[in-house]
Amino acid sequence: MHPRAGQPAQPEDLIDIDEVINAYYDLVPDPAVPEQKVVFGTSGHRGASLDTAFNEAHIVAITAAIVEYRRSQGTDGVLYIGRDTHGLSEPAWRTAIEVLAGAGVTTAVDARGAYTPTPAVSHSILLANGAGTEAGVRTTGPGLADGIVITPSHNPPRDGGFKY
């Protein structure tokens, strides 16, 4: 167990959330700098806005690519989108919804505008695709649903994450 488990955050752990969010909108990644490119790891794209590694331009590009991918695969069902409490999750959520709406993608969000746990998004997709029915879960065909979860998971508070 970590020696600080269960202890209050220390001053050096705290972030300036306004600085983090402003950097999300204000800093523009340079495609010539490898650390500023979109990079998908084992669980989506993660990075920090202050490092120009998770910014609005990244989310616009990733979401536009998802729209193109959905079209190429014939995925035309609801896209479920959720977010967690990290500081960059809400701005990335808003950006993604704007891109999806502009592309005409039917999108489902929490009715209260609240945070949505990853398992809730996964469960919604499975139900929409036939889980619990006699036919079972579909993986192709008209009306197929999918989703986006905006969370860097266990990463530090200054980070953002985007998973499809």
Segments predicted by a language model, with ranges:
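An N-terminal, well-structured beta->alpha segment
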Residues: 1-98, 102
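N-terminal small/polar loop signature for handling phosphorylated ligands or for N-terminal nucleophile
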Residues: 11, 18, 68, 72-158
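A short, gly/pro- and small-residue-rich
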Residues: 158-164
